[in-house]
């Protein structure tokens, strides 16, 4: 849903959704346990107005998407199931399908697995209100009482040529895939 905001430069952000349990101690996160993953579209607005990052992410209802297929994570390491998965995104415009993001191996992200977990734990417990970032400990105080875990969107792909030059328009169809590259080829996904 574009909410008639096409002029604000809307872009698909193909990501992996990690559905995680949090372990808390004294209102701090001491561990994150990724349990499941899925394809996720963190559909974002690209207005560069100096506001908080959250205003570019949370700009309207029905602007995020998660696949109905949720896959269990056996272990969140290089040896786990996620290492086999790639992420791809496409836009169908006027009947033609275009690559939107570059197809990437999930394990190729600069921060993933243990390094990502450690970074997230540190940021969740210490991030202060600074520039485009918001203080996160205020949310943890509520989450520690009311939430077992959280969905974390990780690893947006780089944009393919079409994605770099074209923002989402009303009527576009968006496709985001997280697929097992040991079982499917890029062509399988593109032609799905």
Predicted regions and their residues:
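Short tryptophan-centered beta-strand motifs in secreted/extracellular beta-sheet-rich domains
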Residues: 16-20, 148-154, 170-178
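Short, charged beta-turn/beta-strand-edge "cap" motif at the junction between a beta-strand
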Residues: 24, 156-161, 179-185
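Conserved glycine-rich phosphate/nucleotide-binding loop
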Residues: 168-192
């Amino acid at each position: 849903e574009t909410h008639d905001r096409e002029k604000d430069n809307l872009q698909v952000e193909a990501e992996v959704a990690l559905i995680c349990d949090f372990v808390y101690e004294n209102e701090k996160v001491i561990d994150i346990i990724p349990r499941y993953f899925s394809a996720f579209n963190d559909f974002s607005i690209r207005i560069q107005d100096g506001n908080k990052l959250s205003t570019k992410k949370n700009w309207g209802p029905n602007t995020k998407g998660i696949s109905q297929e949720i896959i269990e994570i056996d272990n969140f390491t290089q040896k786990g199931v996620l290492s086999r998965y790639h992420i791809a995104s496409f836009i169908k415009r006027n009947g033609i399908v275009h690559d939107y993001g570059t197809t990437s191996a999930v394990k190729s992200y600069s921060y993933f697995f243990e390094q990502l977990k450690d970074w997230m734990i540190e940021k969740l417990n210490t991030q202060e209100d600074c520039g485009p970032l918001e203080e996160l400990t205020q949310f943890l105080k509520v989450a520690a009482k009311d939430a077992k875990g959280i969905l974390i969107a990780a690893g947006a792909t780089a944009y393919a040529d079409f994605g770099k030059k074209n923002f989402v328009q009303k009527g576009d169809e968006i496709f985001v895939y997280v697929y097992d590259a040991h079982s499917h080829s890029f062509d399988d996904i593109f032609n799905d």
